[in-house]
Amino acid sequence: GHIICIMPEGVKMRLLEIKGLPVSVLIDFVHRHGGILGPAHPCGEKYLSFTNTGRFYKSPELIKRFDFIEAFNACESAESNEGARKLAEKYKKPGIGGSDAHRPDCIGTGYTILPERVTCETELIALIRSKAAIEAGGVLYGKTAKDKMGPAHKILTYSFWFYNKGGALLKKRKRTLKGKIENPATPIDPIEIPYLHNIKKQK
């Protein structure tokens, strides 16, 4: 699925630009470098949205390790956004909104209202980690390729799957090499300790 990552200003990691990073590794990597992350349109199309991936079916508890959830996406359906909102409420995660704009007239159709002024990525990261009251919303765009194609958009969904899988395979060697440099084995990030403690209690 698509994942939104927010890193502190000045932190640019090449590994984040390479396709095919397993989500559990991505979560560790982003947290280790001081960032936050969450699933985009989590209840949307198969393969492109976290709750409709094989990884979620195998390990649904991974949702607890995200810092926020995109609760509104202007290019998704009302049903998809409602599912995302309920997901954020269920796991007590801050919900953000976005336009997911691929065309100029879609920009600004989704929004996130913060309870205080934010001037940089570090301040935004701190605010979301504090689980501050954040409001997300907007208006549905309704003019995406998916909307225009109707039922035939499933062809587009599967083509994206092949594109992403192919890209991941082609980038495997580069991902491994960059991983050794940017993501070496290190002690567990303190932010993960509550999650790991809960998993231990469940066992």
Regions found by a protein language model. Give the residues of each.
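Short secondary-structure capping/junction motifs at helix and strand boundaries
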Residues: 14-16, 38
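Glycine-rich anion/phosphate-binding loops
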Residues: 17-21
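Aromatic-lined carbohydrate-recognition surfaces of secreted/lumenal glycan-active proteins
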Residues: 35-48
